[in-house]
């Protein structure tokens, strides 16, 4: 019986983690859809092309390795 409590607690934490991950992925998908629905009337074609190329890229992630000094 003593082992049941930690097992149940672990399962609940896993379920919560998976559901919050799914919700954040859903929010990111909605944000990408909103960026795709921008009204571009009255804007030059070259600027529209640059905006669409930027919006097609995945969101930037911080990479601490990019700031490390190399010993070479």
Curated annotation (Swiss-Prot):
Report the GO molecular function annotations.
toxin activity
Q: Which organism is it from?
A: Tityus serrulatus (Brazilian scorpion)
Return the protein name.
Hypotensin-1
Q: Name one GO biological process term.
A: regulation of blood pressure
Propeptide spans which residues? 25-35, 61-72
- Top-level lineage group: Eukaryota
What else the UniProt entry mentions is:
The primary structure of this cryptide TyPep-1 is identical to that of cryptide Pep-1 from Tityus obscurus (AC P0DRE6).
Q: What is its main location?
A: secreted
Q: Does the keyword RNA-binding apply?
A: no
Q: Which residues form a coiled coil?
A: none
The record places the site described as Important for potentiating BK effects at 58-59
